[in-house]
Amino acid sequence: MAKEKFERSKPHVNVGTIGHVDHGKTTLTAALTRVCSEVWGGAAVAFDGIDNAPEEKERGITIATSHVEYDSPTRHYAHVDCPGHADYVKNMITGAAQMDGAILVCGATDGPMPQTREHILLSRQVGVPYIVVFLNKADLLAEDCGGVGTDEYNEMLELVEMELRELLDTYEFPGDDTPIIPGSALMALNGEDDNELGTSAVRKLVETLDEYIPEPERAIDQPFLMPIEDVFSISGRGTVVTGRVERGIVKVGEEIEIVGINATTKTTCTGVEMFRKLLDEGRAGENVGVLLRGTKRDEVERGQVLAKPGTITPHTVFQSEVYVLSKDEGGRHTPFFKGYRPQFYFRTTDVTGACELPEGVEMVMPGDNIQMTVTLIAPIAMEEGLRFAIREGGRTVGAGVVAKIIE
């Protein structure tokens, strides 16, 4: 059977379901594919097809994730759902599935639970920019309160909503402005719609995603950045650095900065080549060589980045969210303690750093996730949301993300 051609006509947006165990994340994921396929076309995916998620490896870490897709009238959504809490932690920290927005599923009968809080915190730490709330199991709440629209039902909904908005505020999301949609994922999955809690609520959710989550900026439209992988000296022409353009475009004749490890310097791009052909620009996703005017071979090194001037700065101290690989994943067999000094691998290079653990935490076990403050021995070009690996002698023992830059 021939593969279907991928439609590039609609903007592509990455979302995912987060929330406490058994609040209905997977049911909602299945309901979204069903409702969208019936209303706007596409394929429905059954609950079982999402629930037994295949395991995949991201940087040596085993993560079970389900990927589904669905369409709204204006967009194509790629949606991730994870079976277990540990999978969410790993997924969000490694950036295996980066989200432009998250759908927080919270049971109306239970209200916010420990993982509800933890997933909101993780979203803040790893830089998920927007959250939309689906208040699930509203049909069960209605049964308990003598029906939809009764005073008791409205009061209970309002209470849970208030709790959720406060929780979102705590983690610096705009609680008051966050859309909260009550409904029943199970009803929608079964094609029912009593009191508009089923298919109507899920349709409303998709319309809300369309309105509330802005279209992500494409890599090519962002400011130029290229991690340096190699440096060559070409007699008579000067210094060439090679790497894969991470974002943006570099044009011949433009001024660029060399950032990281040493003091930031400015230079000019005097040539771009790819496969030994000269080009007038290098674009996001391309592996190129960039010729630098007046830069000596020993003034640039692997681990630095080329960037549009003023768009990225070098830092040494940052707060991070880290997942420590378990023994089974090839990680450490023993815990580590404060004063731990591994290598932090950013983009193309390792830099040694010292770890400061949160107050009251004495040790970190393999398989844990933890917030820690890192002080590097050399500055690295970084911004919040940058991913890194933690290594000991070339072996990966953890994965992390820059949550907040300190200096």
UniProtKB/Swiss-Prot annotation:
Pfam family, one: GTP_EFTU
Compartment annotation: Cytoplasm
Domain of life (superkingdom): Bacteria
Binding site for Mg(2+): 26
Binding site for GTP: 19-26, 81-85, 136-139
Region span, G1: 19-26
Region (G5): 184-186
GO molecular function annotations of the record: GTP binding; GTPase activity; guanosine tetraphosphate binding; translation elongation factor activity
Region (G2): 60-64
Annotated stretches, region: G3: 81-84
Enzyme type, top EC level: hydrolase
E.C. designation(s): 3.6.5.3
Quaternary structure, from the entry: Monomer.
Protein name per Swiss-Prot or TrEMBL: Elongation factor Tu
Organism, as annotated: Teredinibacter turnerae (strain ATCC 39867 / T7901)
